[in-house]
C-alpha cells in the first residue's frame, strides 16, 4: 500500500517549494494562483522570507498547504497513493490531494483558518513545547511547579508492531 501523509504546522522551512516552482510549469501556475487568492506573495515568503515571517501562523499554514498539495500534484503521474491522511492542517491537504476539495477552495479554507488562529494567538499570547523522552508523570509534576496556566496535553502513545501484525490489524 502507498499513502500520502501530509504534515501539520511546524514543517515549514525557508526555501520550501522553490525547486518545484523552478522545475514545473504546473507548480509555478499554482504558486501564482495562490499569490492572487491570498492577496500577498506567499511564494516570495516561502522562497526568500525570514524564518520569523514564515513562522507566523497566517503564513505558515498556507505555505505548508501549498507545498504539500503542489508536491503531491507533481508526483501524481509517478506515484498514485492508495490512501491519503494528514495531521491537523494536513487533513485539508489530504482532501485536496484526493480531489474531495478543489485547490482554490482548499487554499481559501486554509487561509481563513490561519487568520483565525493568528488572531487568537495575538489575543492570547502563549507558547507550546514538545517534550520528548520524559515520563508523563514527571512532565505533569514539572507543570505543577510553573507559575501561570500550564497544561500537559497531547499524550502520544508509542506503538510498535511487526509488519505481519500491522497488516493483520489494517487489512
Predicted regions span which residues?
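Alpha/beta catalytic cores of group-transfer enzymes, especially the acyltransferase/condensing modules
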Residues: 9-11, 38, 98-160, 164
Amino acid at each position: 500500500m502507498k499513502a500520502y501523509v501530509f504534515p501539520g504546522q511546524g514543517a515549514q522551512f525557508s526555501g520550501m517549494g522553490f525547486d518545484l516552482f523552478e522545475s514545473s510549469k504546473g507548480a509555478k501556475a499554482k504558486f501564482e494562483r495562490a499569490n492572487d487568492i491570498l492577496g500577498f506573495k506567499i511564494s516570495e515568503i516561502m522562497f526568500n522570507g525570514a524564518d520569523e515571517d514564515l513562522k507566523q501562523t497566517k503564513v505558515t499554514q498556507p505555505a505548508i498547504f501549498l507545498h504539500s498539495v503542489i508536491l503531491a500534484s507533481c508526483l501524481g503521474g509517478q506515484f498514485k497513493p492508495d490512501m491519503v491522511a494528514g495531521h491537523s492542517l494536513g487533513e485539508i491537504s489530504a482532501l485536496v490531494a484526493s480531489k474531495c476539495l478543489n485547490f482554490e477552495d482548499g487554499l481559501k479554507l486554509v487561509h481563513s483558518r490561519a487568520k483565525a488562529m493568528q488572531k487568537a494567538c495575538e489575543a492570547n499570547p502563549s507558547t507550546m513545547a514538545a517534550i520528548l523522552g520524559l515520563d508523563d508523570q514527571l512532565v505533569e509534576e514539572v507543570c505543577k511547579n510553573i507559575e501561570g496556566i500550564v497544561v500537559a496535553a497531547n499524550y502520544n502513545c508509542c506503538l510498535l508492531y511487526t509488519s505481519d501484525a500491522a497488516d493483520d490489524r489494517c487489512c
